[in-house]
Amino acid sequence: IWCSRRLNIRCLERPCNRIVSAAESSESPSWTRAQVLRDPWFYALLPGILAAPFIITGILFHQVHLVETKDWELQMFTSCYPLYAISATVVSLGAGPIIDRFSAVYLLRFYLVPLALGLALLASTDAVFAAPAFMLLMGASAGGATIMLGALWVELYGNKHLGAIRSLGVSLIVLSTAIAPGVMGVLIDVGLNLNSQFGLLAVYLCLCVVVFTLMSPSFLVERRPPAQV
């Protein structure tokens, strides 16, 4: 009886082994962090990926100067923060199924559009309605980025070294947020007011959207990592 049970167990194990092997062989190639650093497409992505955290941090840091420039009440502006949170939450929940159905690469070309519209609005008017509208648009881009970036690295570079690659991306994002207040402050000091900065940043984000759109077809094709040195 023991021998027959052992034989049955071994027979059941063999197909599973074959299935696992087939799954392993069909996996897309995974890149190491060193290989990612040698990928020119990674550096082409960075100006757009780092733009949103840079801009959002800079604006929130200089919010007092912003409301003084617009002749708004600081209390009114800060009361709009719940709109930012609601927008970011709703878009985050909606972005997940979109990525599941299409891909993070598909979403890449869209997630900066709300922030670009919000900056264009701030640059063009001092009306009070611009504050809540901007918070909603900024939250939409922030929520989309939170979900999209987590999936993008997997789609582009595989999941075997995901921790190392994500840590690289997060480190660069932290660096961009750290320098944003200083850069925007220096520009204010040299005479480039916030409205002008918002207009330039809106144009910059539109260029990033165009670049992402042109790059997306290349990302949909499976790419092999360069040989390790």
Please provide the spans of the model-predicted regions.
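Helix-to-loop junctions at the C-terminal end of transmembrane segments
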Residues: 91-103, 188-189
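Intracellular juxtamembrane helix-capping segments at the cytosolic ends
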Residues: 144-157
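A late C-terminal transmembrane helix in Major Facilitator Superfamily
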Residues: 159-191
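A membrane-interface helix-boundary motif in multi-pass transporters
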Residues: 186-204
